[in-house]
Curated annotation (Swiss-Prot):
It comes from Saccharophagus degradans (strain 2-40 / ATCC 43961 / DSM 17024). It is an enzyme of class 4 (lyase). Pathway: Carbohydrate metabolism; pentose and glucuronate interconversion. Belongs to the mannonate dehydratase family. Its cofactor is Fe(2+); Mn(2+). This is Mannonate dehydratase.
């Protein structure tokens, strides 16, 4: 597997030199200054690629070219945005960046309620707390019919939690949920998010899924023309929020997507932390079933709770079988090599890391994207990968 690292461009406080020192050889990045829906110019892609290569690294994966909401609803200027997207994919391929991660989540990108959840060792993790989310949805946002989406037990806890919050706590919860997170596509106010939510609720799950398929039928031929692999990121978390349709949450969702557009350029990002937030997603089984269409991997672990809450655990200490998953992915790489395929190594990034050590005192660390926490996770995963590779070679002899 290729060890990669998410870099937020030239303004990232974590330099490419530091990334190389952490042991990564590949960079996962985007043109973060380009507005959602706008065309990625070939010259800009090449310029950022040169910055990365001058540091001795490779731009392995684009994460991401955001999909405009007009495309998701097929309203407004969606056709113009699709044409821009197609040309952006072509330009990326011409520049030599052949893997593009994207998502099709409606309204909100990855969502957490607590960005500084304290762990027993005093480091901090990201957490999704169902009680807090329901408190926001039902009692602060006051979304129409929101209460119908939660159990009586959750509603009772949410009401008690809401009543105990002061205005500062309410503002922080709202900021965490709807104000946008690293890699997100924008921020909302309370009024604008209500309007956006209703638009997607009216569309419904199957209507939204069909819009995703229509998008892929237009984008994938462009990707094929330049040898680009598109790999969709799952919903995070992988269940409905705000009553919104979610169509990349389960193995069955992935199966439908791959079957709808059966092209080698239509693939998956296997995000262990996202899919793994559902106990009914068998990550090892998914790696085996979809292996030949997995082009990018996020290795992150979670500790799940019965009501849907979870927090991001140490990479090797959550509810997901990280060793089994890595083993399945290494077996897929060996299969590709035996079949004579080129570029068999699957790009992997350690995804989020805990906030710890000196970074606890820094004011500008992006939630989930600490240097020390990710370096720790990458080192742990590197040890697993090395041990499994040795065992696989010994078994093959």
């Amino acid at each position: 597997m290729q060890e990669t690292w998410r870099w937020f461009g030239p303004n990232d406080s974590i330099s490419l030199q530091k990334i190389a020192q952490a042991g990564a050889t590949g960079i996962v990045s985007s043109l973060h200054h380009v507005p959602t829906g706008a065309l990625w110019q070939l010259e800009e892609i090449e310029a950022q690629k040169k910055i990365i290569e001058d540091a001795g690294l490779e731009w392995s994966v684009i994460e991401s070219i955001p999909v405009h909401n007009d495309i998701k609803t097929r309203t407004g200027n969606f056709q113009e945005y699709i044409e821009n997207y197609k040309q952006s994919v072509i330009n990326a391929g011409k520049a030599g960046v052949k893997t593009i991660c994207y998502n099709f989540m409606p309204v909100v990108d990855w969502t957490r309620t607590n960005l500084s959840y304290r762990l027993p060792n005093a480091s901090q993790a990201l957490r999704f707390e169902m009680t807090d989310f329901a408190a926001y949805d039902v009692y602060l946002l006051q979304r129409e019919n929101a209460a119908a989406d939660y159990s009586e037990e959750v509603l009772n806890r949410a009401k008690a939690r809401f009543d105990a919050m002061d205005e500062t706590e309410k503002d922080l919860l709202e900021k965490n949920i709807i104000a946008g997170l690293p890699g997100g596509e924008g921020s909302y106010t309370r009024d604008t998010i209500r309007e956006a939510i209703q638009q997607f609720i009216d569309l419904g799950t199957e209507g939204f899924r069909n819009h995703m398929f229509e998008f892929l039928r237009e984008i994938i031929p462009a990707a094929e023309s330049v040898g680009v692999k598109m790999c969709i990121h799952p919903d995070d978390p992988p269940f409905s929020l705000f009553g919104l349709p979610r169509v990349v949450s389960t193995a069955d969702d992935a199966r439908k997507l791959l079957n709808a557009v059966p092209s080698p350029s239509n693939g998956l990002t296997l995000c262990a932390g996202s899919y793994g937030a559902r106990g009914d997603n068998d990550l090892v089984g998914m790696a085996k079933e979809f292996g030949d269409r997995i082009y990018f991997v996020h290795l992150r672990n979670v500790k799940r709770e019965p009501d849907g809450s979870f927090y991001e655990a140490d990479h090797l200490d959550g509810d997901n079988d990280m060793v089994g998953l890595v083993n399945a992915l290494l077996c897929e790489e060996r299969r590709r090599h035996a079949a004579g395929e080129t570029n068999c190594a699957i790009p992997m990034r350690p995804d989020h890391g805990h906030l710890m050590a000196d970074e606890l005192n820094l004011p500008d660390v992006k939630p989930g994207y600490s240097y020390t926490g990710r370096m720790k996770g990458l080192a742990e995963l590197r040890g697993v990968i090395h041990a499994l590779e040795v065992l696989q070679r010994q078994h093959a002899l």
